[in-house]
């Protein structure tokens, strides 16, 4: 699949820390580099996602992330999905340290970069987009997340749910 443009994936809920001026500055940097910019968030309206809509919603987000050249996000799951999809990503601190902590786990992936200061954005974009190796090695994923994946599978089995 040919990748085109960039995506901002910022919080828009009550935990949002990014101010409008900074978001506009990020948009301007991305527009100057990539031309086409999309905006998205992982939250779509109030309430919970219905079980029958979960897979479709995940697929839509994965497809969106897989279609762009670069993502700038303050969302933990956005950064993780970029790692899985091989999408260059610059992750911003959001005050909750979750993104920064996970960024430490992913620091060996050259196409994922965590920054605290927006002044580092240009260099970070250069760095992640120039990385030639864009995949998360499965053995590394298994060793880091194997116990969690097994726990999830055990819970699904106990609840009578089928695998994914």
Which residue stretches match the model-derived regions?
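Active-site anion-handling motifs in enzyme catalytic cores
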Residues: 1-164
């Amino acid at each position: 699949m040919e990748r085109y443009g960039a995506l901002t994936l910022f919080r828009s809920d009550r935990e949002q820390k990014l101010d409008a001026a900074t978001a506009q500055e990020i948009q301007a940097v991305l527009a100057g580099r990539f031309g086409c910019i999309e905006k998205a968030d992982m939250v779509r309206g109030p309430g919970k996602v219905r079980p029958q809509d979960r897979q479709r919603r995940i697929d839509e987000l994965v497809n969106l992330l897989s279609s762009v050249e670069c993502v700038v996000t303050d969302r933990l799951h956005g950064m993780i999905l970029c790692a899985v999809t091989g999408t260059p990503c610059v992750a911003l601190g959001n005050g909750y340290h979750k993104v920064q902590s996970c960024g430490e786990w992913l620091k060996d992936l050259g196409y994922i970069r965590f920054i605290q200061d927006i002044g580092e954005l240009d260099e970070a974009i250069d760095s992640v987009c120039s990385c030639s190796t864009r995949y998360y090695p499965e053995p590394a994923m298994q060793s880091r997340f194997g116990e969690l994946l097994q726990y999830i599978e055990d819970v699904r089995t106990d609840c009578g749910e089928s695998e994914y």
